[in-house]
């Protein structure tokens, strides 16, 4: 029996929600946020959100004239344009309703793919915690465990907030190589049947809550930059605002810093770098770690300037106020002629990891229920597990006995805490 219009719409929306929910593991490990609609309309779909505050403390009985200020930093998050599947059907295309439903399922799979690609690319390009190995995974015994454990070690040592959980995503090739090391065995060392059947690696590997895989992870091509140094001594401060041309306060995005170099030839977005002698700090204890501080190139500005993340705030910068020093994340400022180390020296398909609130999916319902759109039929839906909102819309044309169908998702993927997003690159031998 043929389905009526209401049943077709219900089935279509259910198909979209179920399909996208089933194949978006990366997006489901991100934080979700629905911003207020009216304010987004007046701000070009950008909203400023606070990041975790850092507080300076001090000992003593008498703290007269020692009060510190409140410094709350912000990051800009935004939504892009809707992602759509827009197609036309004629009456004779609907004689077999299952063909229509298969098209809906196909659209949902493609839209889910696009979400996962955006998360994967954002993590690979913005991830600033960099774990490299000179060997490919699987070269030595237990090197897969060490590779993942190194990532967890730096997150733990940096004292990064991990209250929402942590996740690690291998690319398929490295997942296959790592599986033998990381799959849970019984007391006799036997690998369970499930590991062969569905590629399952146990949960809570090397401190990560979930270790998964994704075929969406991009290749980070090697950087061809060589012999680059810092040009001039440079230091950076965390600031909540700056004054515009009219003397009014405007927010500052503290994820980024513009660094002056001797040259930028061969550098590109996503390159991973470090500076000689610049070490990470534990965020709370402010102890200097053994690991070099690592950064991601966000943008090549011109022949001598690059924008990097995170902003390096130096503990030894005497010009910092107490509340600014609480945000210090490296031991020392950038010095003139300091060597810049390129970390991605070989092409490699990325592995990525993050604290689960480091990436944020921002989405809003599409307001298509206004009377201006009375000529079409729309059904709004949300996908809570993925944090997405969308519409299923149809419109018929009596002159051609055809109808248009549009499935749209409106969202943006944002790296709100790039300091808590990392990239694993094996095989990095120059």
Curated annotation (Swiss-Prot):
Keyword Cell membrane: no
Annotated site, Involved in capsid stabilization and maturation, chain positions: 61
Origin: domain of life: Viruses
Region (I domain): 223-345
GO-annotated molecular function: identical protein binding
Start and end residues of each stretch annotated as Binding to the capsid assembly scaffolding protein: 2-56
This protein's name: Major capsid protein
């Amino acid at each position: 029996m043929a389905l009526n219009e209401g049943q077709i719409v219900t089935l279509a929306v259910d198909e979209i929600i179920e399909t996208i929910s089933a194949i978006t593991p990366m997006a489901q490990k991100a934080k979700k946020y629905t911003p207020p609609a009216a304010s987004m309309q007046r701000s070009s779909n950008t909203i400023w959100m606070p990041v975790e505050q850092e507080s300076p403390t001090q000992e003593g009985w008498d703290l007269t004239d020692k009060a510190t200020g409140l410094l709350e930093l912000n990051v800009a998050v935004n939504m892009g344009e809707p992602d759509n599947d827009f197609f036309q059907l004629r009456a004779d295309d609907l004689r077999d309703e299952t063909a229509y439903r298969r098209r809906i399922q196909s659209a949902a799979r493609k839209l889910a793919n696009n979400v996962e690609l955006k998360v994967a690319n954002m993590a690979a390009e913005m991830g600033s915690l960099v774990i490299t190995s000179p060997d490919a995974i699987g070269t030595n015994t237990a090197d897969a465990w060490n590779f993942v454990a190194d990532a967890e070690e730096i997150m733990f040592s940096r004292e990064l907030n991990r209250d929402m959980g942590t996740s690690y995503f291998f690319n398929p090739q490295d997942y296959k190589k790592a599986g033998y090391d990381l799959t849970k065995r019984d007391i006799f060392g036997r690998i369970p049947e499930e590991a062969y059947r569905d590629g399952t690696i146990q949960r809570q590997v090397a401190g990560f809550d979930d270790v998964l895989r994704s075929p969406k992870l991009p290749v980070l091509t090697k950087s061809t930059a060589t012999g680059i140094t810092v040009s001039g001594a440079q230091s950076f401060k965390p600031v909540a605002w700056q004054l515009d041309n009219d003397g009014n306060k405007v927010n500052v995005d503290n994820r980024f810093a513009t660094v002056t170099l001797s040259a930028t030839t061969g550098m590109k977005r996503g390159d991973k770098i470090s500076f000689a002698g610049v070490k990470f700090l534990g965020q709370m204890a402010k102890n200097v770690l053994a690991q070099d501080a690592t950064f991601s190139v966000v943008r090549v500005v011109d022949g001598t300037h690059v924008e990097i993340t995170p902003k390096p705030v130096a503990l030894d910068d005497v010009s910092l106020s107490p509340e600014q020093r609480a945000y210090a994340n490296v031991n020392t400022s950038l010095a003139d002629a300091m060597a810049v180390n390129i970390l991605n020296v070989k092409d490699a398909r990325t592995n990525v990891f993050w604290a689960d609130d480091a990436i944020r999916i921002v989405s809003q319902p599409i307001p298509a229920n206004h009377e201006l759109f009375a000529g079409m039929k729309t059904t709004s839906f949300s996908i809570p597990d993925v944090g997405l909102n969308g519409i299923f819309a149809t419109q018929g044309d009596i002159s051609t006995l055809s109808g248009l169908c549009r499935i749209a998702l409106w969202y943006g993927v944002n790296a709100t805490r790039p300091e808590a997003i990392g990239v694993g690159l094996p095989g990095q031998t120059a």
